[in-house]
Amino acid sequence: MMPQLRDSGNHSTAPLDGRTRGEVDAFIRIFGIETEYGVSVTGADAPCDAGQTAMMMFQPIVAQARSTNTYIENGSRLYLDVGSHPEYATAEARDPMDALALDAAGELVMRDLAMDTQHRLREGHGRRAIVHVFKNNADSAGHSFGCHENYLVRRFVPLETIEHELLPFLITRQIFTGAGRVGGQGFQITQRADFLDEAVSSATTRSRPMVNTRDEPHADPDAFRRLHVIIGDSNRSQWATMMKLATTHLVLCVIEQAGREGRESGFARFAFADPGAANHAVSRDASGVGAVFDMADGDVIRGGAVAVQERYLAAVERFVEDHPEVGASLPRTDVHDVIAQWHEALEAFRSGDVDALADRVDWVCKKRLFDALQARTGHLPASRLEQLDMDYHDVANGTVYASLCRRGGMRTLLGRDAADRAVHMPPDDTRAALRGRFVREAKAKGARYSCDWTRLTLMSPHHSEMVLLDPFDFEESERFRQMMDMLA
């Protein structure tokens, strides 16, 4: 039985102002990615605890911000999560490409912290100590950590609708967004399937749901809710990161428009009888077409994840044709190109040419590499495959992924310059622009300050505070200019 969902009741029935009403009526969206990183040290003269190493990584942060929880110049959040996992949450983005740039910036931030820590570790633990920072979702000890996506959705979409209509899409999209994993049960196309135990929940630490329903919109609670997607892997592939955000956005547009018009979207018939079983089946079906799904309405869908994805894609394609204004919802991503690439990916599975996706899908790339090495050597121990798997995800000292990119084995959508720029510059069309400027100026002046997603607080040399409730609003208000003047 699926868990019952409830709103938190923290919103009123007050009428929305004109600007917010326009945002609700449009197809625009806010995107964000939260990534928990794994940490380990090899080559040291004495054992180095992962938690202590993570704390060492954050020593420069604590020295400057007096906390392991801070916001940086690009508007993103940097902090130590439960279990001493360094975590980076991207600033608000209006477009998947902006979210991708911020995500790539997070890799660079983590790499810099790791290399600084490595330099300091070698002074006391030997010159061969190496700090590894893994952008993946499972370690060799069986611990899991997450990559969570955030989507701002309209309040009028019931939580039950999200559960029944979006979850089958999220489960089956993993054929092109999965990062892949070598484990005790062989190769799986996802990293998280063995660790997710519920479909929907309001907790992420006590349980491991696929979708989290805590009502923390970080926006006007009368107008929006924040969809917190747990089911998803940490991607090295830039294409996979862009596609998971863009395709999910388009499916949400269909669901939201049906809600506006008071009708069914048609996606309810794709609900699985057992989402957990479906998730495991997808993860173990590298063909993409072999799994068989029992549906909640008693029907059976054959043809694997591809068959379900084709149904979603057909509905999205019709919707975009009928609502051309959806194209304007993403300022830097062409929705027609997204649809074309979605088609191309599914056709590769349908035709049996899965290797054609090795230059853009993480799990396909890794599996082809591992299969080639096995064929060349005759046999590689499982421990060596696991080592290569981890190296692929090591943003600090890994060589496998970087080598693939250099040789054209993995396509990139952004250059290093764009990632470098995103380390310091937030998107200019969300409130992150204001937060980023505030943080930059406060740090430059040595002022004491704090902030969160919706609030800026200046504590010295003067005290001032302001609320930034609208994530789409990047315009400098009189209040904001006054705060900047206090820092001048």
From Swiss-Prot:
Catalytic activity, EC: 6.3.1.19
Keyword Ligase: yes
Top-rank lineage group of the source organism: Bacteria
Residues that coordinate or bind ATP: R77, T90, W453
Gene Ontology BP annotations: modification-dependent protein catabolic process; proteasomal protein catabolic process; protein pupylation
Keywords: ATP-binding, Ligase, Magnesium, Metal-binding, Nucleotide-binding, Ubl conjugation pathway
Function: Catalyzes the covalent attachment of the prokaryotic ubiquitin-like protein modifier Pup to the proteasomal substrate proteins, thereby targeting them for proteasomal degradation. This tagging system is termed pupylation. The ligation reaction involves the side-chain carboxylate of the C-terminal glutamate of Pup and the side-chain amino group of a substrate lysine.
Pathway stated in the Swiss-Prot or TrEMBL entry: Protein degradation; proteasomal Pup-dependent pathway; Protein modification; protein pupylation
Molecular function GO terms recorded: ATP binding; ligase activity, forming carbon-nitrogen bonds; magnesium ion binding; ubiquitin-like protein transferase activity
Record's miscellaneous remark: The reaction mechanism probably proceeds via the activation of Pup by phosphorylation of its C-terminal glutamate, which is then subject to nucleophilic attack by the substrate lysine, resulting in an isopeptide bond and the release of phosphate as a good leaving group.
InterPro entries in the cross-refs: Pup_ligase, Pup_ligase/deamidase
Catalytic activity: ATP + [prokaryotic ubiquitin-like protein]-L-glutamate + [protein]-L-lysine = ADP + phosphate + N(6)-([prokaryotic ubiquitin-like protein]-gamma-L-glutamyl)-[protein]-L-lysine
Residues holding Mg(2+): E34, Y79, E87
Protein name according to UniProt: Pup--protein ligase
Catalytic residues, chain numbering: D81 (proton acceptor)
Lineage: Bacteria, Bacillati, Actinomycetota, Actinomycetes, Bifidobacteriales
Family membership: Belongs to the Pup ligase/Pup deamidase family. Pup-conjugating enzyme subfamily.
